[in-house]
From Swiss-Prot:
Monomer. It comes from Neisseria meningitidis serogroup A / serotype 4A (strain DSM 15465 / Z2491). The gene is lolA. Pfam families: LolA (PF03548). It is found in: Periplasm. This is Outer-membrane lipoprotein carrier protein.
Length: 207
């Protein structure tokens, strides 16, 4: 079964893209305002990954609490959970009965995932510009400033001041499209919601 091409990339990008306070602002201004103001977000997502050989769609839910906490759960067609507790990133693959743990700094510190725990990382890591509108969605084009970022671009779409869509193309030509729903930009989250304990009987690997 094919898994998402780059889970940490996906997590990182989605941490940028939430409902914003001012629907009147341009898409770039809205994105910057979120990174200045927003501390938490929760919701659901549908993700479609297109490669040269196949297309896969997955569904799930997510929670983010700044600084540095996130939980991403794929619920169908497979079950997989990714948790960042501020120090460690845990990836639990239910089908494989396997947990992989990585230092959070090593796993996402040099990638877009740094946005999850650093409100200033967006402007330091990306070049942002307005990228037009389609079907009522206003887009921001985020281009990584470093050539080794692993992807070519990210497009982030807002509709009526709320996150609506995201698209990214990686360095291998794979394209990921994500739609968001049920967004809550003021969720009641505690740090305990981002604690992960490996289930009994699973293999635990370290990166």
């Amino acid at each position: 079964m094919m898994k998402p091409h780059n889970l940490f990339q996906f997590l990182a990008v989605c941490s940028l893209t939430v409902s914003v306070a001012s629907a009147q602002a341009g898409a770039v201004d809205a994105l910057k305002q979120f990174n200045n103001d927003a501390d938490g977000i929760s919701g659901s997502f549908t993700q479609t990954v297109q490669s040269k050989k196949k297309t896969q769609t997955a569904h799930g839910t997510f929670k983010i609490l700044r600084p540095g906490l996130f939980k991403w759960e794929y619920t169908s067609p497979y079950k997989q959970t990714i948790v960042g507790d501020g120090q460690t990133v845990w990836l639990y693959d239910v089908d494989l009965a396997q947990v992989t743990k990585s230092s959070q700094d090593q796993a996402i510190g040099g990638s877009p995932a740094a946005i999850l725990s650093n409100k200033t990382a967006l402007e330091s890591s990306y070049t942002l510009k307005e990228d037009g509108s389609s079907n009522g969605i206003d887009y921001v084009l985020a281009t990584p400033k470093r050539n080794n970022a692993g992807y070519q671009y990210i497009r982030i779409g807002f509709k009526g001041g709320n996150l609506a869509a995201m698209q990214l193309k990686d360095s291998f030509g794979n394209q990921t499209s994500i739609s968001f729903g049920g967004l809550n930009t003021n969720p009641q989250l505690s740090r305990g919601a981002f604690k992960f304990t490996p289930p009994k009987g699973v293999d635990v690997l370290s990166n």
